[in-house]
Regions:
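Short, surface-exposed beta-strand/loop "edge" segments at domain boundaries and coil↔beta transitions
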Residues: 11-15, 34-40, 55-62, 114-117, ...
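Flexible, processing/modification-adjacent segments and terminal tails
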Residues: 44-118, 138-139
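Generic structural motif
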Residues: 3-5, 90-91, 147, 184
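N-terminal mature ectodomain segment of secretory-pathway/periplasmic proteins
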Residues: 1-54
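A short, sequence-level motif marking secondary-structure junctions
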Residues: 21-26, 42-46, 64-70, 150-153, ...
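Well-ordered beta-strand positions enriched in small/hydrophobic/aromatic, beta-favoring residues
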Residues: 3, 27, 90, 106, ...
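Solvent-exposed coil/turn segments that connect beta secondary-structure elements
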Residues: 8, 23, 32-34, 44-46, ...
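Gly/Pro-enriched, hydrophobic low-complexity segments
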Residues: 101-190
């Protein structure tokens, strides 16, 4: 499948068009605006490997750069790679409701000192198994990022993302310091 959409900065209104494809367990995010860039997540490796393709070639995005913003938005490479989904020893923290839906709250802790997050709490829909929202914490257990699925769509019986809100949080006072939306159009089958 192929989906088009955009990342949009809430403060400036600036948007970055994107194309998202998934084929052979490789997810590709294509950004056409200058400088053009492709970020692809190869889920054939364990853990999944994040690559960046720019003029001059392709390279693995090093762990030390996972906290860098993608296209100047509040969405970073760690968010894009969803690397925290592969962290070992998830812990069930309880249950909650998100948009009226029952969810489990699952906490994962970063097994290394690399990356922007120390721990991540995920609200997982009990019905679909999909993530409804996420809160990420720094090494002092202060919230630094949260995102929430604000719209979903059905594709051949499966629930897929339509809109995601990503917020960066000031760990000192909990205030939102930046907000980006990822919006995706209806998927189209690859030829």
């Amino acid at each position: 499948y192929k989906m088009t959409g955009e990342l949009r900065d809430d403060t400036s209104g600036r948007s970055e068009p994107l194309t998202l494809t998934m084929q052979n367990r490789v997810m590709r995010f294509l950004f056409k605006n200058a400088p053009p860039e492709i970020v692809h997540l190869d889920m054939n490796t364990s853990p999944a490997t994040l690559y960046q393709v720019r003029a001059g070639g392709s390279s693995v995005v090093p762990d030390s750069q996972h906290g860098n913003k993608v296209r100047g938005m509040e969405f970073n490479y760690e968010d894009l790679s969803l690397a925290f989904l592969y962290w070992p020893r998830p812990q069930l923290m309880g249950e909650d409701r998100v948009s009226g839906q029952k969810c489990w709250i699952v906490r994962v802790t970063n097994p290394s000192s690399q990356g922007p997050y120390y721990a991540v709490d995920l609200w997982v829909h009990q019905g679909s198994g999909g993530a409804a929202k996420m809160a990420a914490f720094d090494r002092t257990s202060k919230i630094v990022k949260r995102y929430q699925v604000t719209k979903v769509q059905k594709v051949e019986g499966a629930t897929t993302l339509k809109e995601l809100r990503i917020e960066s949080i000031n760990p000192a006072n909990g205030a939102v310091i930046g907000r980006t939306y990822m919006k995706l159009d209806d998927p189209v089958k690859n030829n």
